[in-house]
Amino acid sequence: MPKYRSATTTHGRNMAGARALWRATGMTDADFGKPIIAVVNSFTQFVPGHVHLRDLGKLVAEQIEAAGGVAKEFNTIAVDDGIAMGHGGMLYSLPSRELIADSVEYMVNAHCADAMVCISNCDKITPGMLMASLRLNIPVIFVSGGPMEAGKTKLSDRIIKLDLVDAMIQGADPKVSDSQSDQVERSACPTCGSCSGMFTANSMNCLTEALGLSQPGNGSLLATHADRKQLFLNAGKRIVELTKRYYEQNDESALPRNIASKAAFENAMTLDIAMGGSTNTVLHLLAAAQEAEIDFTMSDIDKLSRKVPQLCKVAPSTQKYHMEDVHRAGGVIGILGELDRAGLLNRDVKNVLGLTLPQTLEQYDVMLTQDDAVKNMFRAGPAGIRTTQAFSQDCRWDSLDDDRANGCIRSLEHAYSKDGGLAVLYGNFAENGCIVKTAGVDDSILKFTGPAKVYESQDDAVEAILGGKVVAGDVVVIRYEGPKGGPGMQEMLYPTSFLKSMGLGKACALITDGRFSGGTSGLSIGHVSPEAASGGSIGLIEDGDLIAIDIPNRGIQLQVSDAELAARREAQEARGDKAWTPKNRERQVSFALRAYASLATSADKGAVRDKSKLGG
């Protein structure tokens, strides 16, 4: 029977000092012996996805205390990728994931907490907390802040839905008037919550459902809706039950590594492909799997991508649907239900509620459930009122979207595409693979060949795109922006958005060893591995080289002879200490970022730290 970790600091005469300090936090004699549960919050006023979380930790803590536990709350950092986008701030985004994971480990292990409730929401916060949870392997439940309502505005006598990406594109489009750009900007992000499309934050919060570490509704129920409060109340109660099951009944099924098993990771990736999630999810799932010591690699993702259809299409791949529409159609469980009926899921998995996949679907799939309360929860909709307050409205759709032929979520027979929303490509400058969000690629450019325009920084590429130096048919290559080369593997949302602004969204490709925002669509290929800074062949591409992209056949090829590539590699190596670095780039890199770069691996490894360099 495992002993409560917290007993290390609460029992024994030699821990009198520790108990004295615990008493100073409000604990009493009656609390020593109860499980100490960390409420890992991420409230910050910098991020709309987190601005409403200030009081939600207290909400969870009250339920923990009522159920017989002791709750202790702390906060992690949280970077807003949208605000950090397009300048040096983006260098810090991905490295913040490792800082978050480490800070959770530091706090939980330093104070010997027994379990956690992770209150996350945005891009790197959920992955960082997920990595920490699987590293620590103590009972955990995730409950996110929830999605933002979609923006809405009237243009040309028509009400249209908007999000952050629309504001970016229109702001850079010279054909759009100042007044229209201002109107879109003011309407794009109307409420608290994670940005309203199937961007990275919402993708990851959906995947925690598929991994079994969060409750049904976590990924899609709006931040503003009163129904979301119940997820926080339930999490506080349930974590005490899971904690006691493990420590008092020796039930290891309550541990995250047993819930988020290899089968669960495969289900999560299957969901990701079917819903056309952000390419960043590949990076984060690979990283989380390593923390869980699960053999889950790019090869597994490639195999799944070849057999899983696209059953859901959401912004940025279409402006018709946002997360509020996914929820109305049944949310994550609705998509999992269709995948299960198609025979594409591992059924022998459980979630934090203790339910198997079939039991979860029977209870929560809107196509199966007889529970009116569940159906009512999935009718929770937007209010259209600007707010930064959680649970501030209780509007409902008149009906569910259960149209699996023409609705937001489709059945296998009516799939948007027989190929899923993500694909892994391989070729002579992406030997370890690269990722494309096929959900956002127009059918006309699934095969594309063009001359390379090579840039050694995102800034130079943006200047060229906006300056008219990139023309239809070009393949824009942005290198030395990987985890090590950037450092920090910047997101390329501005270059891809500006290609659209210049009318080139369906006429050009963009390839990078960096990554993309979940808001990116178009022929945008990222995570090229190995990255240029690690000696990857993307560092050998020259202006004018032809690059052939073949998504249906999962290929990407630099049309240069092996002999020529060998000669270029020899010339690169001859640069000595300057080999595999940008030739003409001045970038101030802080010590903190240099420390990150010194251990960073390429994207095919999840951009995690290279343990071999630390003797691990």
UniProtKB/Swiss-Prot annotation:
Q: Which reaction does it catalyse?
A: (2R)-2,3-dihydroxy-3-methylbutanoate = 3-methyl-2-oxobutanoate + H2O; (2R,3R)-2,3-dihydroxy-3-methylpentanoate = (S)-3-methyl-2-oxopentanoate + H2O
Q: Where does [2Fe-2S] cluster bind?
A: C122, C195
What's its top-level EC category? lyase
Task: List cystine links.
Answer: none
Task: Please give the biological process terms from Gene Ontology that the record holds.
Answer: isoleucine biosynthetic process; L-valine biosynthetic process
Catalytic-site annotation from UniProt:
S517
A molecular function annotated in GO for this UniProt entry is: 2 iron, 2 sulfur cluster binding
N6-carboxylysine modification sites are K124
Q: Which domain of life is it from?
A: Bacteria
Where does it sit, as one GO cellular component term?
cytosol
Q: In which pathway does it act?
A: Amino-acid biosynthesis; L-isoleucine biosynthesis; L-isoleucine from 2-oxobutanoate: step 3/4; Amino-acid biosynthesis; L-valine biosynthesis; L-valine from pyruvate: step 3/4
The Enzyme Commission number assigned here is 4.2.1.9
Q: Does the keyword Iron-sulfur apply?
A: yes
The residues listed in the UniProt record as binding Mg(2+), with positions renumbered to this chain, are D81, D123, K124, E491
Q: What does this protein do?
A: Functions in the biosynthesis of branched-chain amino acids. Catalyzes the dehydration of (2R,3R)-2,3-dihydroxy-3-methylpentanoate (2,3-dihydroxy-3-methylvalerate) into 2-oxo-3-methylpentanoate (2-oxo-3-methylvalerate) and of (2R)-2,3-dihydroxy-3-methylbutanoate (2,3-dihydroxyisovalerate) into 2-oxo-3-methylbutanoate (2-oxoisovalerate), the penultimate precursor to L-isoleucine and L-valine, respectively.
Keywords on record: 2Fe-2S, Amino-acid biosynthesis, Branched-chain amino acid biosynthesis, Iron, Iron-sulfur, Lyase, Magnesium, Metal-binding
Cofactor(s) for this UniProt protein: [2Fe-2S] cluster; Mg(2+)
What does the cofactor field's note say?
Binds 1 [2Fe-2S] cluster per subunit. This cluster acts as a Lewis acid cofactor.
Family as reported in the entry's similarity comment = Belongs to the IlvD/Edd family.
Provide the assembly information: Homodimer.
Q: What protein does this entry describe? A: Dihydroxy-acid dehydratase
